[in-house]
Amino acid sequence: MFSYYDECDTSMSLKDIDMLHPVILCGGSGTRLWPLSRDMYPKQFVDLGGDRTLFKDTVRRVASLPDIGVPFIVCNEKHRFYVSASLLECGMQGRILLEPAPRNTAPAIALAAFAARAEGEDPILLILPSDHMLQNTEEFNEGVAKAANLARKGHIVTFGITPDGPKTGFGYIRQGEALGGDGFRVVRFVEKP
């Protein structure tokens, strides 16, 4: 059971199976950047100056992708007005899905997957956190295009970056064989120590 809040034109559907359907995850308790962010005002909505927030940057990155569907945004009741206002300020539409209770990443993705599946046969989802800072949008778009090609072939795709050294705050992906130049098989995920 989930709550669904739709802030946009309901005539839109997920008819095109080849189209990517972005899911922006807006969970989190806002404790990492305290006192700037807090439970009622998490870091993805903190003003970075010049009409920028991490959430707006994510929305604008989504808008820069070709052949993209209307994004699903998963958030809780407390943050839905921040999401709605930010979408309006960016000139974007979005489907806002309200989590009945915060349960971390996997249930939030499942919520969006069920909502997307209700509107289309087998949609390809692009799962994005709302609080990442990415500098190179062109490189991001190229990576998404390669990932979409792999997903259309039936692969589940995750993004990774080459680390510049060991970090205890991050897990690692053990890379396997190449998949035609667009990616690699995953041998295993190594959880953070």
Where are these regions (language model features)?
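Conserved N-terminal catalytic core of the sugar/cofactor nucleotidyltransferase
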Residues: 2-24, 32-35, 39, 47-129, ...
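Conserved core of the sugar-phosphate nucleotidyltransferase
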Residues: 137-193
